[in-house]
C-alpha cells in the first residue's frame, strides 16, 4: 500500500471510530469544506512533517517532538531533543525530513538555543529512532546570540538540489542587523545538509559577510515553501503593525527591512524611509492590517476542487487560512480568507490531498484537517 492509500484508509477508519467526530462545514468560494479534528491535546505545536509510514512528526514549542498517527493518537515525547530556550517566542520550532529519509532516517529541527543567558536560532540534525533521536548534531548556529525573546523565525525547506534553507528573524531588538551582512540576524541562510556552505552562495567571496546568507532584510519569516513549478523559495514574514509580506527569496537580494516597509510601529509612527527604495525588493503581496502569517504551502493535489496551484497561508492574528490565486507573473490575482476560528501556526498538504493545520492555542492546540465536503 502506498503512502496516499495508507492515509486515505486511516482517515476512513478515524471517521468510523469517531476520532473525527469534531467536525464542521466551512464555506469556500470553490465549494464547501469539511474541517475536522485529527488530534488534540498538543501544547503550542509549531511544525509538522509527514512520514512514509503514514504518521506525522509534530514539534511543540516547549521542547517536545511527537509521533501522531493519522487517526490522531499522540505518542509520548521522543527523547534526545536538544535543549531549547522556551521563553517568549522561542522553543522547538520547525521539523523537516532529509530528502533521503527513507534510506537514512535523518530529520532536521530548528530551535532557539540557550547561550549564557542569551539565545539564537539553531538547526540540528539527527537520526529518528523508534522513541528517541540518535546521533544528534547541531549543524548551524545563528551569529550572534542575542538577549531577546522574539523573532527567531524559523522554517526549514530543502530545495531540489538538496540544499537546506533556514529562515531567521531580526530578534525584535536587533532590527538594524537585518541589513548587516556580518550577522545572520534577519536573514535566510542556505547550507548543505551537513552544515557546510554551498560554493555558489551569493556572499561566499565577500569579506566580512556570513557565507551562509542567501537573502537579507527580513523581519521574521515563519512561512516558506518551494514553488512546485519553478523550485524557487517563497517566504512570508510578519510586519509590525501591518506590512506582512510574501516574497520570493532570491540569491543576494535585499528585502528592505527595516529601511522600507508597509507597516508602522505598534505605537503608530512610521518606520524607516518609506515603502520603496532603489536596490530593495518590493513584496509580491502584503497585508494591511496584519493577518499574522505563519506556515505556508502550495496546493498541488486534486482532492479540493479549484485549489490546485494556489498558495495557502496560515494566519495567527486573523485566525484564518488565506487562499491566494497566483498568476503567471507571480502576482496575487485573488485572495480568499477561510475562517478557522483558531490561530493557525502551520499549513501542510497531506499525502491524501487534504490540508492539515496546526493551531496554536496554548495547551488546547490541535491538528485540523481541511477536505472537500462534496
Language-model segments: residues:
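Beta-propeller blade signature
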Residues: 121-131, 180-194, 248-250
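Short, conserved, GDST-rich strand-edge loop motifs in beta-rich repeat architectures
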Residues: 166-184, 243-245, 249
Amino acid at each position: 500500500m502506498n503512502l496516499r492509500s495508507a492515509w486515505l484508509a486511516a482517515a476512513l477508519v478515524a471517521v468510523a471510530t469517531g476520532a473525527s467526530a469534531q467536525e464542521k462545514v466551512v464555506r469556500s468560494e470553490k465549494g464547501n469544506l469539511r474541517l475536522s479534528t485529527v488530534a488534540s491535546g498538543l501544547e503550542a505545536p509549531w511544525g509538522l512533517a509527514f512520514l512514509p509510514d503514514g504518521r506525522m512528526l509534530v514539534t511543540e514549542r516547549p521542547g517536545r517532538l511527537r509521533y501522531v498517527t493519522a487517526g490522531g493518537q499522540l505518542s509520548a515525547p521522543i527523547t534526545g531533543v536538544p535543549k531549547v530556550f522556551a521563553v517568549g517566542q522561542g522553543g522547538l520550532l520547525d521539523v523537516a525530513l532529509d530528502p533521503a529519509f527513507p534510506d537514512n532516517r535523518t530529520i532536521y529541527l530548528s530551535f532557539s538555543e540557550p547561550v549564557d543567558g542569551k539565545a539564537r536560532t539553531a538547526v540540528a540534525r539527527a537520526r529518528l529512532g523508534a522513541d528517541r533521536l540518535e546521533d544528534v548534531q547541531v549543524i548551524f548556529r545563528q551569529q550572534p546570540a542575542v538577549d531577546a525573546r522574539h523573532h527567531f523565525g524559523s522554517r526549514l525547506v530543502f530545495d531540489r538540489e538538496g540544499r537546506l534553507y533556514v529562515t531567521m528573524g531580526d530578534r525584535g531588538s536587533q532590527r538594524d542587523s537585518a541589513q548587516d551582512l556580518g550577522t545572520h540576524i534577519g536573514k535566510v541562510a542556505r547550507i548543505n545538509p551537513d552544515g557546510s556552505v554551498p560554493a555558489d552562495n551569493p556572499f561566499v567571496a565577500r569579506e566580512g559577510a556570513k557565507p551562509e546568507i542567501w537573502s537579507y532584510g527580513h523581519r521574521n519569516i515563519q512561512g516558506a515553501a518551494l514553488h512546485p513549478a519553478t523550485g524557487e523559495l517563497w517566504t512570508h514574514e510578519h510586519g509590525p503593525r501591518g506590512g506582512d509580506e510574501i516574497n520570493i527569496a532570491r540569491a543576494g537580494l535585499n528585502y528592505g527591512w527595516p529601511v522600507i516597509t508597509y507597516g508602522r510601529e505598534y505605537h503608530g509612527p512610521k518606520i524607516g524611509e518609506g515603502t520603496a527604495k532603489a536596490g530593495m525588493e518590493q513584496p509580491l503581496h502584503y497585508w494591511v492590517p496584519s493577518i499574522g502569517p505563519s506556515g505556508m504551502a502550495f496546493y498541488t493535489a486534486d482532492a479540493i476542487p479549484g485549489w490546485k496551484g494556489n498558495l495557502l497561508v496560515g494566519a495567527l492574528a486573523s485566525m484564518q487560512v488565506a487562499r491566494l490565486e497566483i498568476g503567471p507573473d507571480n502576482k496575487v490575482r485573488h485572495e480568499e480568507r477561510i475562517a478557522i476560528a483558531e490561530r493557525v501556526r502551520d499549513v501542510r498538504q497531506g499525502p491524501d490531498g487534504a490540508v492539515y493545520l496546526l493551531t496554536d492555542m496554548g495547551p488546547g492546540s490541535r491538528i485540523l484537517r481541511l477536505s472537500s465536503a462534496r
